[in-house]
Amino acid sequence: MRTVLRALGACLLCILAVATGCRFGGAVGAAGIGARSGKLEVSEQAVRLLAQVARQPRLTLAMAGDCMFDRGVRAICDERGREWLLSAVRDTLRAADVAFLNLETSIARGGARLPGKGIWFRSAPEFAQELANAGVDVVTLANNHVLDYDDPAFAETLSNLAQTGIAVCGGGRNMADARRPAVLSANGISVAFLGYSEFAHIYWSAARPKRFVAGEASPGISCWDREAIIEDIRRAKRLADHVVVSF
C-alpha cells in the first residue's frame, strides 16, 4: 500500500504540473501525463495507477475528547433522557468504521471518593451501553478521573465496558494490561490504539496517597514515560497497520 501511495503522490504532482502548464498555455509532460494546447492528456499507465489506488481499502476514524456523564451532564440526562445526550453525534459516530474517545469518568455504582480531589466523576453503568449504541468502539482510560472512586469503581468500569463490547486502552488490571494496545479492524485495515496520562503519578491527599498509575499487580492507567511509549508503539506496529496514540 505504501508503494501505491507514493506513486499516487507522484501522479498528483504530475497533474499539478499539467494544470500549471495549461494555465500559461504551455506544454508539460511527466510520467505519461501531458498538456498540449490547453488539453489535459493522461496516459493509460496513469489511469491504471489511479484505478489501483481507488480500489485500495479505506478506514474512517471518528475521534472525540473527554466524555463523562456526571454533575451537570447527569442533570440534563435526568431531564431529557440518556438517549438524547449523544443524539447529535450518533450518526457521525456510527458512520465511522471505528469511533474512539477519552472516557473521563468511571462507569460504576460502587467505590468511594478519593480524598482531596475536589472534583469527582462517576457515571451510571447504563452509560456504557449508551456509548455502544452511539457507535463508540474503543476508549482510552488514561486520564485523571477514571479512578476518582478508587479501585472498586475502576474494576466495575472495566467490566461494564467489556459487557458492551467496547475496547479499552490506557488502563487495565495491571501495567501490562494498561500498556497493551486495543487493536480494531475494518475493511481489511487494522488500527492499534494506545493511551497515556501525565497525571498518573499524582495524588491529591497525604491521607490517601493513591496514584492512578498501574503496577505490576495492581490496576490503574498507563503513564507518560517516553521510553515505554516508544517501546509500546514499536510493539503495536507489529500488530496493526496503523497506530493511534492518545495523551
What is each model feature region?
Residues 1-9:
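Bacterial N-terminal signal peptides that target proteins for export
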Residues 4-5, 16, 34, 234:
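Residues marking helix boundaries in flexible regions
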Residues 9-19:
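Bacterial N-terminal signal peptides
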Residues 22-247:
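Acidic, metal/ion-coordinating pockets
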